[in-house]
């Protein structure tokens, strides 16, 4: 490795520890449009009894389907249609809809809502079933997301991710915020607010905890935040830098990057903060660990071969088997993320003076750039593997973007009002 390359990689590692985005006072609006050339035409009628609701379920369902890029919303008119109505499916097919949705929202004596809907296939002239959900004023949005997930899976054969959540870091003035939002960027909540940087949020497999790195004690320390209770606790405060937490599939362990003995190396620590164990034994920089979904491997970035590349080793560490290089396209590759099915690897590659998001088939080794942006970082797969969320630059500011993992359409910028946002992480399916 040349001195310039080594300094560049060390600068990258340092930047991962000290940057957390520019000012943002924001509602993140997620849009993934134009996915593929064929979109499924669907008509969603207004649900009955929605007029005075704090959230209109029908609007949420339509918006979810539209932003996925997989559906075209056919005008269903303004007349509400309950799930119990007799529907002329042929008429809806004639209007261009291959599917039709009807439903209702009714408030019970306890103040809760009963949300019912039914999905029809207008081509085969048959019902595809539906759901009956219970919601409150604050969970009507979740009910809408669950309905959209049901429709997505029934019509496309892939589980939807509308009811999942995002985490990201924004900065307002001199204050950093770790925020959690719905997958559409709505309903954002502040998990942590600090005058010091917050970086590297990582969701637990259960979706109930987020690990992250905070500089609030003037050095990088790894914490775990329990979202239901708001409780958080320190996991790694070793000498030097504590960074890049990654959960094991069973939620019992975190892989972390520590500079405990000098150069940054990969370690594991129990989720309760004990049981520190070193996994790599190199004289190089080893960082950015990420578990394969089956728990067998840890992927990581290392400059041991002369320049930053992605390697994988047994989850037990290099004592159980030598690390193997995984990326060979390009001379500078970082930020490994494995898809939920274990078939794809997303990473950032330095290309033509910029940094682009690549996706590699782990079986064939074929790798392709899937974005038209050139300041990409922090990739994160959706729980169904269909999309990759990442940070990039647009119009001179830091933004989030989402792109189909197969590169079938250009990335779409996630609109943030009032500033910039970084450090995205797409949460798992809700259990």
From Swiss-Prot:
Cell compartment(s), UniProt: Periplasm
What's the main place this protein lives?
periplasm
Say if the entry is tagged with keyword Aminoacyl-tRNA synthetase: no
Q: Which InterPro entries match?
A: 6-blade_b-propeller_TolB-like, PD40, Tol-Pal_TolB, TolB_N
List UniProt keywords, sorted A-Z.
Cell cycle, Cell division, Periplasm, Signal
Signal peptide residues are: 1-26
Q: Does the keyword Cell cycle apply?
A: yes
Q: Name one GO cellular component term.
A: periplasmic space
Provide the GO biological process annotations.
Answer: cell division; protein import
Q: Which cystines does this chain contain?
A: none
Superkingdom classification of source? Bacteria
Annotated region Disordered: where? 406-431
User: Function of this protein?
Assistant: Part of the Tol-Pal system, which plays a role in outer membrane invagination during cell division and is important for maintaining outer membrane integrity.
Quaternary structure annotation from Swiss-Prot or TrEMBL: The Tol-Pal system is composed of five core proteins: the inner membrane proteins TolA, TolQ and TolR, the periplasmic protein TolB and the outer membrane protein Pal. They form a network linking the inner and outer membranes and the peptidoglycan layer.
Protein family: Belongs to the TolB family.
Q: What is this protein called?
A: Tol-Pal system protein TolB
Origin organism of this chain?
Burkholderia cenocepacia (strain HI2424)
Highest classification ranks of the organism: Bacteria, Pseudomonadati, Pseudomonadota, Betaproteobacteria, Burkholderiales
């Amino acid at each position: 490795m040349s001195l310039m390359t080594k300094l560049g990689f060390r600068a990258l590692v340092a930047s991962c520890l000290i940057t957390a985005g520019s000012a943002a006072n924001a509602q993140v609006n997620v849009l993934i449009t134009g996915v593929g050339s064929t979109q499924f035409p669907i008509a969603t009628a207004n649900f009955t009894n929605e007029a005075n609701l704090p959230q209109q379920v029908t609007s949420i369902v339509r918006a979810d389907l539209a932003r996925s890029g997989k559906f075209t919303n056919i005008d269903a008119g303004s007349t509400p249609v309950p799930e119990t109505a007799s529907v002329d499916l042929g008429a809806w097919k004639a209007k261009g809809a291959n599917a039709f949705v009807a439903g209702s929202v009714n408030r019970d004596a306890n103040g809760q809502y009963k949300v019912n809907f039914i999905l029809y296939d207008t081509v085969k002239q048959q019902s595809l079933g539906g759901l009956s959900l219970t919601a409150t004023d604050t969970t009507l949005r979740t009910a809408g997301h669950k309905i959209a997930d049901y429709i997505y899976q029934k019509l496309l054969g892939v589980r939807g991710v509308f009811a999942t959540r995002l985490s990201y870091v924004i900065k307002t003035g001199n204050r950093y915020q770790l925020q959690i939002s719905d997958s559409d960027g709505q309903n954002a909540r502040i998990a942590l607010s600090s005058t010091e940087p917050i970086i590297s949020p990582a969701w637990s497999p259960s979706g109930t905890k987020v690990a992250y790195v905070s500089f609030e004690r003037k050095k990088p320390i790894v914490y775990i935040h329990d979202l239901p209770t708001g409780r958080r606790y320190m996991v790694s405060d070793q000498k030097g830098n504590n960074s890049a937490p990654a959960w094991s599939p069973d939620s019992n362990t975190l892989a972390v990057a520590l500079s405990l003995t000098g150069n940054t190396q990969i370690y594991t620590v129990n989720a309760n903060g004990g049981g520190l164990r070193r996994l790599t034994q190199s004289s190089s920089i080893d960082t950015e660990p990420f578990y394969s979904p089956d728990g067998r491997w840890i992927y990581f970035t290392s400059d041991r071969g002369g320049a930053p590349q992605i390697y994988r080793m047994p989850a037990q560490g290099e004592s159980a088997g030598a690390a193997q290089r995984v990326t060979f396209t390009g001379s500078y590759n970082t930020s490994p993320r494995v898809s939920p099915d274990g078939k794809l690897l997303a990473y950032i590659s330095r290309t033509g003076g910029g940094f682009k998001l690549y996706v590699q088939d782990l079986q064939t080794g074929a790798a392709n750039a899937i974005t038209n942006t050139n300041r990409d970082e922090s990739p994160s797969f959706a729980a169904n593997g269909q999309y990759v969320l990442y940070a990039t630059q647009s119009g001179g500011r830091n933004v989030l973007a989402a792109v189909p993992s197969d590169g079938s359409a250009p990335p779409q910028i996630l609109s943030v009002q009032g500033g910039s946002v970084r450090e995205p992480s797409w949460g798992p399916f809700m259990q």
